[in-house]
Amino acid sequence: MAKIDNRPEPPGSELSAPVALAAEHELSDFDCGEPALNEWLRSCALKNESRFSRTYVVCAGRRVVAYVCISAGAVERAAAPGKVRRNAPDAIPVSIVGRLAVDRRFAGKGLGADMLADALRRIAVASQSIGMAAVLVHAKNDAAKRFYLRCAEFLEYPNNSRTLFLPIETVVAVFG
C-alpha cells in the first residue's frame, strides 16, 4: 500500500497491507464519521472473529486506519436478482461484505476501494473451495451505495434499494 500523502502522521506511519485483525491493533482512535461503524470495530470485531466474521485492517503502525468485514451467508432465492438465482437452490450461498470503513484522516485517497478489492480477492479464493453464488452488500446509506456501484458491477435488487449483489463469476473473472 502506498503512503497517504499530505497527512500529518507520526514517523513510521507507512500503511500496512491488509492483515487479519488481531488483539495488538489499536482501535480506540479510529473515526470514520459513522458512530455505529466505529463502535462495531471497537466492541464487536474481535469477538466475532471466532465464529461469525473475519475483519481485515490496514494500519499506520499499529493504529487501524481502515477495515473490511466479510462473512458467509445465504439469501432466499426470491430475494436475489435473476442472474444470481438462475438454477439456484432455495437458499443461495453468498459471501457478505458486512462493514467497510476508512478513518476520516485517510479518506479520499482510494483506501476504501483498495479494501473492497482486497475483500473481493479473498472471496474469489474462497469460492474455489466452497460454493457461493454472489457477494452481498447491504449499503448503509446512499453514499455507501454509490461507492459500491462505482467500484464494481454490483446489481441493485430490488431496483432502487441498497441491497447489492455481485455475481461470483464477475468476482472470479476480475480477482481470481
Residue spans for each PLM region:
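Non-catalytic substrate-recognition and accessory regions of acyl/acetyltransferase enzymes
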Residues: 1-109, 113-176
